[in-house]
Amino acid sequence: MPEGEMMHKLQDVIDRKLLDSRRIFFSEPVTEKSAAEAIKKLWYLELTNPGQPIVFVINSPGGSVDAGFAVWDQIKMISSPLTTVVTGLAASMGSVLSLCAVPGRRFATPHARIMIHQPSIGGTITGQATDLDIHAREILKTKARIIDVYVEATGQSPEVIEKAIDRDMWMSANEAMEFGLLDGILFSFNDL
């Protein structure tokens, strides 16, 4: 068997074992594709054993707000209680996803970093003035929705959150816990 094929089979075995232990790993940018994969895994676990805990491990630089909120909404719809564990990085929409756990179940590893900021529009936007105005209003609505998520998750005031996300705000796991984004820091798998 060629080495590449053997590695692919090994990866399949590892992925199956992790899914069977109700662990979902989100270790990539938030895209339509990565969101669809996460949603399929969430629903597989929900349909095979509803109400049983799921651990959602996040190491993501963020990405699409719409794709991220698709995952968020599905997590909120299932009956299985979800624990989030940030390892490495949860930035931008990745940080939002880290907040979708049940209360008291938002964790990070000791060297994890969290970055929060306001949404942005990538690339170049062209069009008529009216179209640009529509885009501007939509991104402000998205910003308000993200502020609401951070306010609810942290207990901070909307004014504090709006100031915090005005620019990229980088935090260590300890700083994120003090800010209210995390409930604890994991030093062992046994802490789950």
Swiss-Prot record:
CDD domains tied to this protein: S14_ClpP_2
EC number: 3.4.21.92
Domain of life of the source: Bacteria
Record's catalysed reaction(s): Hydrolysis of proteins to small peptides in the presence of ATP and magnesium. alpha-casein is the usual test substrate. In the absence of ATP, only oligopeptides shorter than five residues are hydrolyzed (such as succinyl-Leu-Tyr-|-NHMec, and Leu-Tyr-Leu-|-Tyr-Trp, in which cleavage of the -Tyr-|-Leu- and -Tyr-|-Trp bonds also occurs)
Pfam families listed in its UniProt record: CLP_protease (PF00574)
Alphabetical UniProt keywords: Cytoplasm, Hydrolase, Protease, Serine protease
Any one GO molecular-function label of the UniProt entry: ATPase binding
Protein's GO biological process: protein quality control for misfolded or incompletely synthesized proteins
Transmembrane regions: none
Active site residues per record: 92, 117
One GO term describing the cellular component: cytoplasm
Functional description taken from the UniProt entry: Cleaves peptides in various proteins in a process that requires ATP hydrolysis. Has a chymotrypsin-like activity. Plays a major role in the degradation of misfolded proteins.
PANTHER family in UniProt: ATP-DEPENDENT CLP PROTEASE PROTEOLYTIC SUBUNIT (PTHR10381), ATP-DEPENDENT CLP PROTEASE PROTEOLYTIC SUBUNIT, MITOCHONDRIAL (PTHR10381:SF11)
Similarity section: Belongs to the peptidase S14 family.
Name of the featured protein: ATP-dependent Clp protease proteolytic subunit 1
Organism: Chlamydia trachomatis serovar L2 (strain ATCC VR-902B / DSM 19102 / 434/Bu)
Encoding gene (name): clpP1
